[in-house]
């Protein structure tokens, strides 16, 4: 454990940030799973709604630096393609 006051503070801050990032990544995984599940069920309306939610979550995570913006764009693109293929 750190001995200096500033190092202790930095450690606490890094733990907070890690928890926040972990929560955001979990949220991303959950919304992506929801879209994929709706696509597998071939439920176009639910898939479209889930895609909208997923796009929002991914864009927010990218904006906050949790994931890279190109990774977010790639995921959104692939999910949009999957939802578009549902008949």
Swiss-Prot record:
Gene Ontology biological process terms, A to Z: translation
Functional description taken from the UniProt entry: Binds directly to 16S ribosomal RNA.
Pfam entry (one): Ribosomal_S20p
Keyword Kinase found: no
Chain intervals for the UniProt region annotation (Disordered): 1-26
Gene that encodes it: rpsT
Family: Belongs to the bacterial ribosomal protein bS20 family.
Listed name of the protein: Small ribosomal subunit protein bS20
Origin species: Nitratidesulfovibrio vulgaris (strain DSM 19637 / Miyazaki F)
HAMAP family according to UniProt: Ribosomal_bS20
Gene Ontology cellular component annotations, sorted alphabetically: cytosol; small ribosomal subunit
MF annotations from Gene Ontology: small ribosomal subunit rRNA binding; structural constituent of ribosome
Keywords tagged on the record: Ribonucleoprotein, Ribosomal protein, RNA-binding, rRNA-binding
Superkingdom assignment: Bacteria
Disulphide-bonded residues: none
SUPFAM superfamilies named in the record: Ribosomal protein S20
